[in-house]
Every structure is written in structure tokens, then in C-alpha cells.
Amino acid sequence: MIVALLYLILAGAYLLVIPIAVLFYLKQRWYVASSIERLLMYFLVFFFFPGLLVLSPFANFRPQRRQVQV
């Protein structure tokens, strides 16, 4: 029973908790990241890809519309 609970906690962290943190990190740092930090971002997306796929229908992090001054 303990092992099943441990697997459930690890699966929840891998598929939900950490990918949510990765999405917010990418949203905050995407346009200002250095090259090493961008490499870390690519690794995180590669490593947590299944969780990001699970969350992708619900996440909407498109850039905000620009305000054009006339």
C-alpha cells in the first residue's frame, strides 16, 4: 500500500505539479533568458513533455496583444 501511494505521488508530481511550475517558469523567463538558461528550458520541456501534453489543453500562455500607439 505504501509503495502504491509513493508511485501515485511521484506520478502526480511528474505529470501535474512540476510541469505547472515549468510552464510558469517559461512564461516568466522566455524573452529574457540567456543561452545557458534557454538550454535548461529546452531540457525541462524535453524531460517533462508528457506532463506538458496533459496540461496543454488547459494552459493558455499566449503573448498579450500589443498596444499600438498612433
UniProtKB/Swiss-Prot annotation:
Pfam families: NdhL (PF10716)
Lipid bilayer topology: Multi-pass membrane protein
Keyword Heme listed: no
Enzyme class: translocase
Cellular component per GO, a single term: plasma membrane-derived thylakoid membrane
Reactions listed under catalytic activity: a plastoquinone + NADH + (n+1) H(+)(in) = a plastoquinol + NAD(+) + n H(+)(out); a plastoquinone + NADPH + (n+1) H(+)(in) = a plastoquinol + NADP(+) + n H(+)(out)
Localization (cell): Cellular thylakoid membrane
InterPro entries registered for this protein in UniProt: NADH-quinone_OxRdatse_su_L
GO molecular function ontology, one term from the record: oxidoreductase activity, acting on NAD(P)H, quinone or similar compound as acceptor
Highest taxon in the source lineage: Bacteria
Keyword terms, alphabetized: Membrane, NAD, NADP, Plastoquinone, Quinone, Thylakoid, Translocase, Transmembrane, Transmembrane helix, Transport
Transmembrane segments: 2-22, 39-59
EC number(s) stated in the UniProt entry for this protein: 7.1.1.-
The protein's role, per its UniProt record: NDH-1 shuttles electrons from an unknown electron donor, via FMN and iron-sulfur (Fe-S) centers, to quinones in the respiratory and/or the photosynthetic chain. The immediate electron acceptor for the enzyme in this species is believed to be plastoquinone. Couples the redox reaction to proton translocation, and thus conserves the redox energy in a proton gradient. Cyanobacterial NDH-1 also plays a role in inorganic carbon-concentration.
Family per record: Belongs to the complex I NdhL subunit family.
PANTHER family in alphabetical order: NAD(P)H-QUINONE OXIDOREDUCTASE SUBUNIT L, CHLOROPLASTIC (PTHR36727:SF2)
Subunit and interaction comment: NDH-1 can be composed of about 15 different subunits; different subcomplexes with different compositions have been identified which probably have different functions.
Designated name of the protein: NAD(P)H-quinone oxidoreductase subunit L
Organism of derivation: Nostoc punctiforme (strain ATCC 29133 / PCC 73102)
